[in-house]
């Protein structure tokens, strides 16, 4: 009798995706982040579901409902901090996953890469709306500042902002719709992740060498299932350590003050994972220019496959491209630091230089380095 997992309509999909999937024999731990992102998404959906059972999306009671969750609900504090810090872990895994894709040339799988960029936008939108829900000072002012950016769009801008707000300012209608969107988007993300995986399995995984690995494939189970479980255990270890020892390490103290439209915090800044984009936004003195730069800072990823000029796929054997890649990483860390600083003399110019360098590296320097390396090989 044939195995049920190979014949059952549902089981055979799971089988061909996670059990009998032919995988390259040399993929490193950098390939673990896809499964870690899946785990993060499941954790976020589950903790979010339990939080939604006790949360009220009303301006009068939102802040106190979060307090109620932390004080009165059984393990409510744990669920709340798992959700908040789970978002940080999600973004750490996302950035490492994207970095891996850039380094090893995984962006050459066009459909998979473009759905990935779409996923990044969806996750960023979800995280932004989630940050508004506790209705603290930074929630309110973050929502006001970021939604206000849409007013920079010519002709329809101001109408668009009022349409999103559901009034003339960030208020009850805004909070209610943000909660609705924050609840539905993770399920859309899960569906997109399924499509992401579908396209990946059309081609098979890339590997560190960037060469075709069809001649040397191994089954996903048990080799990579056990490897993924190790990654998941490490992720859980880091997340629980963060939640149980310093749950507010990555948060903003201002968000423990209830939202007050009459009192602006001295420094309005988003969560740490948006700081790099926020720094790029602030580095351009023009409002529309800043908004365009903000969108392009993420959208530039979609252009990367078309700027691949190298004869080799991976950066494994390309020292000049490697050097530029690590400069890009350092530049992003610099932008993250600048995004959290006040708009004062040394920080303004550093932010502007780092923003210019960011676009210059991706759009100009890395493609040129690839051409140079091609010539070194005398091809």
UniProtKB/Swiss-Prot annotation:
GO cellular component: mitochondrial inner membrane; respiratory chain complex III
A Pfam family recorded for this sequence: Cytochrom_B_C
TM annotation in the entry: 33-53, 77-98, 113-133, 178-198, 226-246, 288-308, 320-340, 347-367
Binding, a ubiquinone: 201
InterPro entries: Cyt_b/b6_C, Cyt_b/b6_C_sf, Cyt_b/b6_N, Cytb/b6-like_sf, Cytochrome_b, Cytochrome_b_C_euk/bac, Cytochrome_b_N_euk/bac, Di-haem_cyt_TM
Gene Ontology MF annotations: metal ion binding; ubiquinol-cytochrome-c reductase activity
Further remark: Heme 1 (or BL or b562) is low-potential and absorbs at about 562 nm, and heme 2 (or BH or b566) is high-potential and absorbs at about 566 nm.
Upper lineage: Eukaryota, Metazoa, Chordata, Craniata, Vertebrata
PANTHER family attached to this UniProt entry: CYTOCHROME B
Cofactor(s) the protein requires to work: heme b
Function: Component of the ubiquinol-cytochrome c reductase complex (complex III or cytochrome b-c1 complex) that is part of the mitochondrial respiratory chain. The b-c1 complex mediates electron transfer from ubiquinol to cytochrome c. Contributes to the generation of a proton gradient across the mitochondrial membrane that is then used for ATP synthesis.
Keywords: Electron transport, Heme, Iron, Membrane, Metal-binding, Mitochondrion, Mitochondrion inner membrane, Respiratory chain, Transmembrane, Transmembrane helix, Transport, Ubiquinone
Primary localization: mitochondrion
UniProt membrane topology term: Multi-pass membrane protein
Amino acids binding heme b b566: 97, 196
Cofactor binding note: Binds 2 heme b groups non-covalently.
Subcellular location: Mitochondrion inner membrane
UniProt similarity note: Belongs to the cytochrome b family.
Protein name, per record: Cytochrome b
GO biological process: mitochondrial electron transport, ubiquinol to cytochrome c
Gene: MT-CYB
Annotated heme b b562 binding sites: 83, 182
Complex and partners: The cytochrome bc1 complex contains 11 subunits: 3 respiratory subunits (MT-CYB, CYC1 and UQCRFS1), 2 core proteins (UQCRC1 and UQCRC2) and 6 low-molecular weight proteins (UQCRH/QCR6, UQCRB/QCR7, UQCRQ/QCR8, UQCR10/QCR9, UQCR11/QCR10 and a cleavage product of UQCRFS1). This cytochrome bc1 complex then forms a dimer.
Highest taxon of the lineage: Eukaryota
């Amino acid at each position: 009798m044939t195995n049920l997992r190979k014949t059952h309509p549902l089981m055979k999909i799971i089988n061909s995706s996670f059990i009998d999937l032919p995988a390259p024999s040399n993929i490193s731990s950098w390939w673990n982040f896809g499964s870690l992102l899946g785990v993060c998404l499941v954790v976020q959906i589950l903790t979010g579901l339990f939080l939604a059972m006790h949360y009220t999306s009303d301006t009068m009671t939102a802040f106190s409902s979060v307090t109620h969750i932390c004080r009165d609900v059984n393990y409510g504090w744990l669920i709340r901090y798992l959700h908040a810090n789970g978002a940080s872990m999600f973004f750490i895994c996302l950035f490492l996953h994207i970095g891996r894709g850039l380094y090893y040339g995984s962006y050459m799988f066009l459909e998979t890469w473009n759905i990935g960029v779409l996923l990044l936008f969806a996750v960023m939108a979800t995280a932004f709306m989630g940050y508004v829900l506790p209705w603290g000072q930074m929630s309110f002012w973050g929502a006001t500042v970021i939604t206000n950016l849409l007013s920079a769009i010519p002709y329809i801008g101001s109408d668009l902002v009022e349409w999103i707000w559901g009034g003339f300012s960030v208020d009850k209608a805004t909070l209610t719709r943000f909660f609705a969107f924050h609840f539905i988007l993770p399920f859309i993300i899960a569906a997109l992740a399924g499509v992401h995986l579908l396209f990946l399995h059309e081609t098979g995984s890339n590997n560190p060498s960037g060469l075709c690995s069809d001649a040397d494939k191994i089954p996903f189970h048990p080799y990579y299932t056990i490897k993924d479980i190790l990654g998941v255990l490490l992720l859980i270890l880091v997340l629980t350590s963060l939640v149980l020892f310093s749950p507010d390490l990555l948060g903003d103290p201002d968000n423990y003050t209830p939202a007050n439209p009459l009192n602006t915090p001295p420094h309005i800044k988003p969560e740490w994972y948006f700081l790099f984009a926020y720094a790029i936004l602030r580095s351009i003195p023009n409002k529309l220019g800043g908004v365009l730069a903000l969108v392009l800072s993420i959208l530039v990823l979609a252009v990367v496959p078309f700027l691949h000029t190298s004869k080799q796929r991976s950066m494994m054997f390309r020292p000049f491209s490697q050097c530029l890649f690590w400069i890009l990483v350092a530049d992003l860390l610099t932008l993250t630091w600048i995004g959290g600083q006040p708009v004062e003399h040394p920080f303004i110019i550093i932010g502007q230089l780092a923003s210019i360098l960011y676009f210059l590296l991706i759009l100009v320097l890395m493609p040129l380095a690839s051409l140079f390396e091609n010539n070194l090989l005398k091809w």
